[in-house]
Amino acid sequence: MMKFAVPVFPGSNCDHDMVNALRDILHVTADLIPATATSLAGYDAVVLPGGFSYGDYLRSGAIARFAPIMPAVIAFANAGKPVIGICNGFQVLTEAGLLPGALQANRSAKFICQDSPLRIANHETIFTTAYGSTDQISLPIAHGEGNYYCDEATLAQLRANHQIIFEYVENPNGSTANIAGITNEAGNVLGMMPHPERAVEMILGSTDGLGIFQSVIASQEEVTHA
């Protein structure tokens, strides 16, 4: 059975939602890992959850990037293993240099909490294959600093390498090129502002978030059986 690690920083608040989605809905092993830990040995994937790590002082994710667990996360990613950063987790990944660009305050300068339609821009990743031919999904967003920014050279590289995975249909926050989620060039690290863990059962209003985790699980099963 696949094992997911969910690092918990002071101020994380979506960690239990993430573990619930993985354990109870997807029936895989998921453990909460304290930010003070220094090893991810034995795990197959890592998910950095949403929240307000270290109170989002300085910048969102800026202090979490220096947590004791982060060298292990960086090594995990550099080894080609799946890493997902959701909302604050995305911010941490950019601060850690695992993903390009940065997350700024929303253009409206207001916290946004709503469902947001997304276009799947690349179906051929370890995070999106389960969506098949589905072109559009809807996921909840909840952030004050979700406005993705990168310079023109970085945007050109993201497009050339097909690293833009999710795009807002109706850009809620001012993100460059409507970007809602990107991967690293190797394709094993995903950062996204929307919350797939909040869309995993119909009592929550949608199951559109399941495909991301189902894709990762399927990709690792292929590796195991290869």
Curated annotation (Swiss-Prot):
Q: Which CDD domains match?
A: GATase1_FGAR_AT (cd01740)
What GO molecular functions are on record for this protein? ATP binding; glutaminase activity; phosphoribosylformylglycinamidine synthase activity
Catalytic activity, as annotated: N(2)-formyl-N(1)-(5-phospho-beta-D-ribosyl)glycinamide + L-glutamine + ATP + H2O = 2-formamido-N(1)-(5-O-phospho-beta-D-ribosyl)acetamidine + L-glutamate + ADP + phosphate + H(+); L-glutamine + H2O = L-glutamate + NH4(+)
Q: Which UniProt keywords apply?
A: ATP-binding, Cytoplasm, Glutamine amidotransferase, Hydrolase, Ligase, Nucleotide-binding, Purine biosynthesis
* Domain Glutamine amidotransferase type-1 residue range list: 4-226
Per its UniProt record, what Pfam families does this chain match?
GATase_5
Presence of keyword DNA repair: no
Top-rank taxon, per record: Bacteria
Q: Which InterPro entries match?
A: Class_I_gatase-like (IPR029062), PRibForGlyAmidine_synth_PurQ (IPR010075)
Describe its assembly.
Part of the FGAM synthase complex composed of 1 PurL, 1 PurQ and 2 PurS subunits.
Q: Which NCBIfam families match?
A: FGAM_synth_I, PRK03619.1
Name the record gives this protein? Phosphoribosylformylglycinamidine synthase subunit PurQ
UniProt organism field: Lactiplantibacillus plantarum (strain ATCC BAA-793 / NCIMB 8826 / WCFS1)
The upper taxonomy is: Bacteria, Bacillati, Bacillota, Bacilli, Lactobacillales
Q: Which gene encodes it?
A: purQ
